[in-house]
């Protein structure tokens, strides 16, 4: 007996609805065993941003926590006791004592090497007594000097320069804007009228003497073209549009987002509207960068405060760099979101997106989605069972991923605050324990973590996987400076690292490199690949004479790889597409698949139309008579 089609549809919908509940829980809490709440190590206080760096210079990664109504924390993992403990203790003789900064209301935190000494400085953004505009207490920029951490912004030379940020801000991030291996601190300030533009603090090389500990700072935001006034919220940095130089994406509140494209000289131009990511009527929060469909282009995922969340896939239709929102209805469901993280938690090759929500006017569970690549189609997005990381009543304010215990599986740390003091939460991942993994740590020419570098792992079966070494993302946070690759049952055959200045290294891999951590130093000279080494690049790629995996251009083959009814061959990253020979009239162009004609970028009143409206003040309008279509 056959089942009626409508019943099949109903059954399919019910199965899909229950998938996230039936699947194995992604996260289990280990807070009680790894970071037991107590006054010294995990105090019940208001916390916000979290960052990961090597604080003590010992080679392992520590976790920095921005304390708002309590001290900042520095959590180090004790391999013997299997616990995280705070090394920034209340003892003035401790080299980490200054990092506590008990007087500051810290909200954002980031770390990077600003002076080229090979060790990362630590920046805490404070928002004392201010939601926007001027604050009553300045930010702190800590450098390890004279055997302890000291605040550079308090040095006489910088006090005279009046460089300290005294404006209420939100996120901070690190950007090597010129590709020189020294970083600037990008500060997403929350402006009040014409008070509090975004800032960009970096070392003034001409006035500094790093060998003697003299670091003169200046604000280069105006010269770089990023001194914008807005309600700054989230920031993410990496080669989004550029090949290797870092671009900057900011999702903002009460104003359009920014996508600052690097002009190649360390200055930036905002192209958010042209690229379709300005989202002017929403209020951004957490943001992350990732290559979800493994096409070599960097995509943007972010959450809007009680608005639709976005998953912007980068396209290159007709040689124009644009983004399209592929978020499903469930993925986009509005929530009081804070942090957004993109990572392969279960090491199955596919990326997950974690939404950290704050219990705002009632419970609001955290959520996690898997974004799975599909050939010649947008990725499949499915909600997973978030498990004990749901935290229905958690006042989530920040979160990071890092492998603090060295088992090759990412750990999740969540902070809480806002209006209810809660301790930190720590979660381990349940599924994927048998999956293969690879972790890559590139270094700058000075030996520091190469934040903003692009790392590509080529595999035997699943093509290339791309990661950006994080310089700030999530929301108020900064992830570990590691390219973490989950490989499932696959094997990585080659890894390439691209530094912001365009330098690159290709390293062939063997099976013995799997389940390990690779440190990749900055290339002083070109390192040739031995002729005896045969590199497998996977389907759609081939090794060139320099041992680099490059895309095969199937469209140059003879006879043609495309059939007669779809004769136009379009080479894609690791593959190709065949489409009809569509011809379009003036003002129109073929869509990405060549199946229809769409309007070219339209102009109304002398300015480009936004990605979310066809006419100013008119939304979701179809102008059928003109043959124009709006991509909503």
Give residue spans per PLM region.
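Cleavable N-terminal signal peptides of Sec/SRP-targeted secreted and luminal proteins
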Residues: 4-20, 619-630
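Beta-propeller blade repeat segments, especially FG-GAP/WD-type strand-to-loop junctions
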Residues: 19-29, 71-89, 133-153, 195-220, ...
């Amino acid at each position: 007996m056959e089942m009626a089609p409508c019943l099949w549809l109903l059954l399919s919908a019910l199965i899909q609805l229950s998938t996230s509940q039936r699947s194995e829980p992604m996260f289990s809490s280990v807070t009680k065993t790894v970071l037991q709440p107590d006054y010294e190590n995990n105090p019940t206080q208001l916390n916000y941003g979290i960052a990961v760096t090597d604080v003590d210079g010992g080679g392992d990664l520590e976790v920095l926590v921005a304390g708002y109504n309590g001290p900042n924390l520095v959590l180090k993992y004790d391999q013997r006791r299997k616990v995280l403990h705070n090394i920034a203790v209340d003892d003035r003789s401790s080299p980490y004592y200054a990092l506590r900064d008990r007087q500051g209301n810290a909200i954002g935190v980031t770390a990077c090497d600003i002076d080229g000494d090979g060790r990362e400085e630590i920046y805490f953004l404070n928002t004392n007594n201010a939601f926007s505009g001027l604050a009553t207490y300045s930010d702190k920029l800590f450098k390890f000097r004279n055997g302890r951490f000291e605040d550079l912004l308090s040095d006489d030379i910088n006090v005279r320069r009046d460089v300290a940020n005294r404006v209420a801000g939100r996120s901070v991030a690190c950007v090597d804007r010129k590709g020189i291996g020294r970083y600037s601190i990008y500060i997403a300030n929350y402006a009040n009228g014409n008070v509090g533009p975004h800032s960009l603090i970096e070392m003034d090389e001409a006035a500094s003497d790093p060998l003697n500990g003299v670091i003169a700072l200046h604000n280069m935001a105006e010269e770089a073209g990023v001194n914008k006034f807005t309600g700054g919220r989230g920031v993410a940095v990496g080669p989004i549009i550029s090949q290797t130089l870092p671009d900057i994406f900011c999702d903002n509140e009460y104003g359009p987002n920014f996508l600052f494209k690097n002009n190649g000289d360390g200055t930036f131009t905002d192209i958010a509207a042209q690229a379709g990511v300005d989202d002017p009527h929403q209020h951004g929060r957490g943001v992350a960068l990732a290559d979800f469909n493994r096409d070599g282009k960097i995509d943007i995922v972010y959450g809007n405060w009680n608005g639709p969340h976005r998953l912007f896939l980068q396209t290159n239709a007709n040689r124009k760099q644009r983004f399209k929102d592929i978020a499903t209805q469930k993925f986009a469901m509005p929530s009081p979101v804070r942090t957004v993280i993109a990572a392969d938690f279960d090491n199955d090759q596919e990326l997950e997106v974690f939404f950290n929500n704050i219990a705002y006017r009632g419970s609001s569970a955290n959520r996690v989605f898997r974004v799975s690549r599909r050939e010649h189609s947008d990725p499949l997005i499915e909600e997973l069972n978030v498990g004990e990381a749901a935290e229905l009543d958690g006042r989530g304010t920040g979160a990071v991923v890092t492998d603090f215990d060295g088992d090759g599986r990412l750990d999740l740390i969540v902070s809480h605050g806002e209006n209810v003091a809660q301790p930190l939460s720590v979660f381990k991942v349940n599924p994927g324990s048998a999956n293969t993994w690879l972790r890559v740590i590139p270094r700058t020419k000075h030996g520091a973590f190469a934040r903003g570098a692009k790392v590509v792992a080529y595999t035997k079966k699943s093509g290339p996987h791309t990661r950006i070494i994080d310089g700030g993302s999530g929301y108020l946070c900064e992830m570990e400076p590691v390219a973490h690759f989950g490989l499932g049952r696959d094997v990585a055959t080659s890894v390439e690292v691209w530094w912001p200045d365009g330098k690159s290294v290709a390293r062939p891999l063997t099976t013995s490199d799997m389940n390990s951590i690779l440190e990749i130093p900055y290339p002083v000279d070109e390192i040739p690949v031995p002729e005896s080494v045969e590199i497998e690049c996977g389907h759609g790629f081939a090794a060139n004479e320099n041992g680099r995996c490059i895309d095969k251009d199937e469209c140059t083959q003879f006879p043609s790889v495309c059939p007669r009814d779809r004769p136009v061959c379009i080479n894609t990253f690791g593959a190709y597409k065949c489409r009809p020979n569509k011809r379009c009239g003036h003002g129109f162009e073929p869509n990405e698949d060549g199946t229809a004609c769409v309007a070219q970028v339209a102009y109304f009143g002398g300015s480009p139309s936004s990605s979310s409206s066809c006419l100013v003040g008119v939304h979701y309008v179809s102008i059928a008579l003109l043959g124009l279509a709006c991509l909503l």
